[in-house]
């Protein structure tokens, strides 16, 4: 049976993804200005992976916000950020990944490019990497690897997240000469990661989501108790 008949939402999934991406980055004029929205909306976390430094971003990235709190020299457990992540996970779970995440949609669009497609069936063990990324890069390193002031870097955002380059560094550098001049080896490293994800997304279906995304890992942990649950149609498996 067609999965779109089983789930009416699937029929409108592309429109929902586009709408969610637009709402998450609603401040479109900022792309031309090379500025960031800095209003009260930035105190609210969006559900998907979306860079705080994107000119159009209407809210904060939950991964970046969580790292900022635990990497602070005055670290206190953030009930707000942890609570909102749990709320997103319990209410929506992996629905966020499939319908509301801008970077997930970006990878899906790339996968539509005509090319040979490769199965990830034999690469299933790689899916556990995202849990390691969540534990090590999002939690442990920002908490434990601190400088003399007791502050930790947002390791995932700084060294691994390709969304920051795509939505933040690239559009800002196009309109801001100062940012262009400041780009260095770290930008080159992150740009290479983004390029690898782009190429990988053409031949694999959402490789970053499957293997490296810590936000997806967190939501996956709550999938069994979420109101929207991801179920596998075994008759469709090959």
Model-derived regions: residue spans:
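Non-ligating segments of multi-cofactor redox enzymes
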Residues: 1-238
């Amino acid at each position: 049976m067609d999965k779109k008949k089983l789930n009416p939402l699937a029929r409108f999934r592309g429109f929902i993804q586009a709408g969610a991406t637009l709402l998450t980055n609603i401040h479109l004029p900022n792309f031309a200005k090379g500025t960031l929205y800095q209003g009260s909306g930035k105190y609210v976390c969006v559900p998907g992976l979306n860079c705080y430094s994107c000119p159009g971003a209407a809210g904060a990235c939950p991964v970046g916000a969580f790292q900022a709190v635990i990497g602070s020299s005055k670290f206190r457990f953030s009930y707000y950020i942890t609570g909102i992540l749990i709320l997103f996970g319990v209410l929506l779970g992996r629905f966020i990944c499939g319908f509301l995440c801008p970077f997930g949609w970006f990878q899906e669009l790339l996968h539509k490019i005509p090319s040979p497609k490769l199965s990830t069936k034999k690469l299933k063990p790689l899916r556990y990497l995202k849990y390691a990324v969540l534990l090590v890069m999002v939690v442990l390193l920002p908490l434990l690897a601190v400088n003399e002031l007791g502050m930790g870097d947002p390791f995932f955002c700084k060294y691994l997240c390709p969304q920051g380059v795509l939505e933040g560094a690239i559009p800002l550098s196009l309109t801001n000469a100062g940012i262009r001049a400041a780009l260095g080896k770290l930008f080159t490293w992150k740009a290479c990661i983004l390029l690898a994800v782009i190429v990988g997304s053409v031949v694999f279906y959402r490789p970053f989501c499957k293997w490296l995304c810590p936000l997806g890992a967190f939501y996956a942990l709550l999938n069994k108790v979420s109101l929207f649950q991801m179920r596998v149609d075994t008759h469709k498996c090959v």
